[in-house]
């Protein structure tokens, strides 16, 4: 499925202001959860599309979390991506309109791992310029505590812990008795809390505080 179609189906209106060199993409916070910003990029995940896995029988598997993510770049980050592709001898077609990257993560809560299933470089129409399937597996607890990736994944996990039934409803329109039983077991196991190192509540509170602060800034408060 093309990235443009996926974004459109989820009704994700992005608005660009001013010229490309100076434009700052507006990401709707009712769809995307802002996690953090570095010097060169902003990091979000799509809370409206995040969902659990399914077993071969179609039963909810809350031990697996599927998370679409988004990074938006500034001009320096864009130039860096282009320079690296040029150095590697890769095609630059479409990269004059690069604005960011979408990734699809598969988080295995039982194993404590995150797998990068797919990555799409995006242009200003949110179409995919290039798609890759890295399949890189990261052990979450092995990441440095202050790394951007660790902080991002912990924010996703904290969100999952506070929005489980909402995520379940996004996975299946109608939850069966078996689905609800799996969710009850998931609540009892609380694998997410163990991955957060016992600081799940603090992480969630921080994520909510950061989200509120970002919303206030967007609203001009």
Residue ranges and their predicted role:
Residues 5, 15, 23-24:
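Generic ordered-secondary-structure signal
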Residues 9-18:
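Bacterial N-terminal signal peptides
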């Amino acid at each position: 499925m093309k990235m443009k179609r996926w974004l459109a189906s989820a009704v994700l209106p992005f608005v660009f202001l001013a010229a490309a060199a100076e434009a700052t993409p507006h990401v709707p916070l009712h769809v995307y959860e802002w996690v953090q910003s570095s010097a060169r990029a902003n990091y979000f995940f799509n809370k409206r599309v995040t969902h659990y896995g399914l077993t071969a029988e179609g039963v909810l598997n809350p031990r697996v979390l599927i998370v679409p993510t988004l990074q938006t770049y500034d001009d320096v980050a864009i130039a860096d991506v282009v320079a690296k592709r040029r150095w590697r001898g890769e095609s630059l077609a479409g990269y004059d309109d690069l604005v960011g990257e979408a990734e699809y993560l598969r988080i295995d809560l039982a194993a404590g791992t995150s797998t990068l299933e797919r990555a799409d470089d995006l242009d200003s129409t949110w179409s995919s310029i290039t798609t890759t399937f890295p399949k890189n597996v990261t052990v979450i607890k092995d990441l440095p505590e202050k790394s951007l990736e660790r902080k991002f994944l912990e924010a996703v996990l904290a969100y999952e812990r506070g929005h489980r039934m909402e995520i379940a409803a996004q996975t299946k329109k109608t939850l069966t008795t078996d689905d609800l039983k799996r969710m009850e077991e998931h609540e009892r196991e609380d694998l997410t809390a163990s991955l957060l190192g016992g600081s799940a509540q603090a992480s969630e509170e921080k994520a909510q505080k950061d989200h509120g602060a970002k919303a206030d800034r967007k609203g001009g408060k």
